[in-house]
Amino acid sequence: MAIGLSTYAFFWRASSRVPNPLGLAAMLEQTAESGAGVFQICDYAAVEALSPAELEKLRQRAVDLGIQLELGTRGLATDHLTRYLTMARALDVRFIRTMFNSATHKPTQDEALALLRCVLPEFEQYNIQLGLETYEQVKTRDVLAVVDAIDSPALGICLDPGNCVAALEYPHEVIELTASRVVNLHIKDFAFARQEGWVGFTYSGCLLGTGLLDYDALHQTIRPNERNINQIVEHWLPWQASAEETCRLEDAWTRHSLNYLYTRNPYANRSSHIL
C-alpha cells in the first residue's frame, strides 16, 4: 500500500489563477520530494495530448523517482476508456479512476453495465483496475449495483465519502456500504461552516483531521494496509485572499495530510527521493 498525491492536491498551484502554475513534470517532482509514493493524474486533460515519446519520458521519470503513477478521468464511453487503457499501459499504470458521467454523457444503470462489460475484458487482460468514484451525481447504491453485477477483479470502487454528502448520503454509511468493493481511496476532510448573517452554510474542505471525516473509522473498515489499497490525498481548499496565500496554504495542507496519514500508516511505501 502507498500514500499518494492527486493533481487535486495541486489544484490552485497548477491553475491559471497563479502567476507560475505548475506543470505535470513539476507536480511529479514535488510529489517525490514530499515523500509520497503515488502520483494520481486525475481529471488533468493535458495528459491526453502527450505523445508516445512524452509518455515514455514521464514514465521513466516516475521510475527514477520511485513514484507509482495512476490515472483519473470521467465517463464510461468505450473509446474514451480504451484510450486511457492505452495510456495506462504506456505509463505502467495499474489503476484508473473514472465516474459514471462525463460532460456530454450521463448513462443509465443499464447503459453503464453494457459499456463496462465492453471494455473490462481488456482491463482484465492487462491487469489494470478501474475504479468508479462515489460522488453526488449518482447514488452510491447504483454505482455499487453495477460493480456487484459485473463482479470483475478489474472493477471496484474509488471511495470518496465526502463527495456523497451533497446527495444527502452519510459518509459512514457510504463507507460501510462500499467497503468490500473499494480498490482506491481519496482522502480529504470536509466541514460545514455557517455563512455570515446565518443565511445558510458553506460545505468545503478543511485541514485533515479537523472536520467530519472519521479517518480512523474509515481505516478500520477499509483496512487499506491489509488489502493493498492506495490512499490518495486531495483537497477542497477555498481560494484565499491572494494567490500567494492560497498556494502557501495548499502546500501546508498537503504536508500536513501526508504526515497525518504516514503517522497512521507507518508501513506505507514512500518515494525514494524524499528531501
Curated annotation (Swiss-Prot):
InterPro entries (alphabetical): IolE/XylAMocC-like, Xyl_isomerase-like_sf, Xyl_isomerase-like_TIM-brl
Domain of life: Bacteria
Reaction catalysis annotation: 3-oxoisoapionate + H(+) = L-erythrulose + CO2
Keyword terms: Carbohydrate metabolism, Decarboxylase, Lyase
GO molecular function per UniProt: carboxy-lyase activity
Pathway(s) per entry: Carbohydrate metabolism
EC number: 4.1.1.120
Annotated function: Involved in catabolism of D-apiose. Catalyzes decarboxylation of 3-oxo-isoapionate to L-erythrulose.
UniProt-listed PANTHER family: HYDROXYPYRUVATE ISOMERASE, XYLOSE ISOMERASE
Protein name: 3-oxo-isoapionate decarboxylase
Species assigned in the record: Pectobacterium atrosepticum (strain SCRI 1043 / ATCC BAA-672) (Erwinia carotovora subsp. atroseptica)
Gene behind this protein: oiaC
